[in-house]
């Protein structure tokens, strides 16, 4: 199967458009949580949950997060397409899951997603807060980075 065929087969159809919020992804996360792979790892400024999804048992650790800027949802859609591939039970997926451990945060900035802005509810660009760590979302990202110890990170 080539990449285009995989895309057609595993594209997540339930999330479309550019406005992606927790309300859009929570049903998907509930469906994916068959083996306790989904959990809340923190809260946003407005006390919205920040979810993680973890899958795989490989030695190489890959950390992925999306919507650090709430109005940038393309990666969220791509992330769920990729999660569908990983859950496909295909030979490719099985090889990936034996090689890698994936840790994903589908929406790091749920308040920004809801307000459709790059900033969080405190009007802070989380991408500019990675050193100061003044925001709860930035702290969650750093805590997971330090505890998961990824070999590769994708934002």
Stretch-by-stretch model annotation:
Residues 43-46, 57, 70:
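Short active-site-proximal "capping" loops at secondary-structure junctions
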Residues 59-61, 73-155:
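Active-site/substrate-binding loop(s) of hydrolase catalytic cores
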């Amino acid at each position: 199967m080539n990449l285009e065929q995989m895309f057609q087969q595993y594209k997540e159809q339930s999330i479309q458009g550019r406005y992606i919020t927790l309300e859009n992804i929570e049903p998907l996360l509930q469906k994916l949580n068959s083996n306790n792979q989904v959990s809340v790892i923190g809260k946003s400024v407005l006390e919205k949950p920040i979810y993680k999804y973890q899958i795989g048992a490989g030695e190489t650790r890959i950390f992925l997060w999306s919507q650090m800027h709430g109005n940038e949802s393309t990666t969220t859609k791509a992330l769920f397409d990729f999660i569908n591939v990983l859950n496909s039970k295909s030979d490719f997926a099985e090889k990936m899951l034996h090689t890698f451990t994936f840790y994903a945060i589908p929406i790091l900035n749920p308040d920004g997603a809801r307000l459709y802005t790059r900033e969080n509810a405190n009007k802070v660009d989380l991408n500019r807060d990675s050193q100061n760590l003044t925001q709860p979302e930035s702290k969650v990202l750093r805590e997971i980075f330090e505890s998961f110890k990824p070999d590769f990170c994708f934002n």
